[in-house]
Amino acid sequence: RITAYVSIMNGCFNRCSYCIVPYVRGPIVNRAANAIISEIQTLAQSGWREVTLVGHNVQQYSGEYRTNSLKQRRINFTDLLKLVADTGIERIRFLTSNPADLTIETLRLMADTESLCPSLHLPLQSGSDVILAAMHRRYTKKEYIDLVRSFYNLMPNGSLTTDVIIGFPGETE
């Protein structure tokens, strides 16, 4: 019992030109933060040491959270990571981030929070701005490189993985 996978959302709004997910799973449906936290606390009490938060684009998470005073508010992914870190689970990972939505705030939290593993899956998809635009990706090669630099500046020993699509229609290089 080492790693448990916890779904935080389903669906996607991005509509990348090559992807079927928004048509099959529909728009994003976020789980309530309290349900996620409760599941992780139960996993930790059952001996699980690590959780991987899963969603098609976790950076677009926007879920309801009810505080101890019963006030309800909407929180973003970075806020959710803070709550998960407070559960006492030993290690936290997440999949997958879209470069267009990844924030420096999330990267700083990863660098500053011991339980957040310094590993990131950040799909590049293409190194060509023309192809990225044809894919309907919402970032440029330079923006991607800037994110990678920020990641390694904050976490020099971090681990970064990616996806690259080769042979996209219209690609000549």
Which residues fall in each region the model found?
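Iron-sulfur (Fe-S) cluster-binding segments and ferredoxin-like electron-carrier domains
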Residues: 19-35, 63
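Ordered, soluble secondary-structure elements with a strong preference for glycine-centered loop motifs
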Residues: 30, 170-173
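Short, surface-exposed alpha-helical recognition segments that flank or form part
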Residues: 7, 31, 135, 139
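Fold-independent oxyanion-binding glycine-rich loops
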Residues: 9-10, 22, 56, 97
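Conserved SAM/AdoMet-binding glycine-rich loop
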Residues: 45-171
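N-terminal pre-triad scaffold of radical SAM enzymes
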Residues: 1-18, 41-45, 49-52
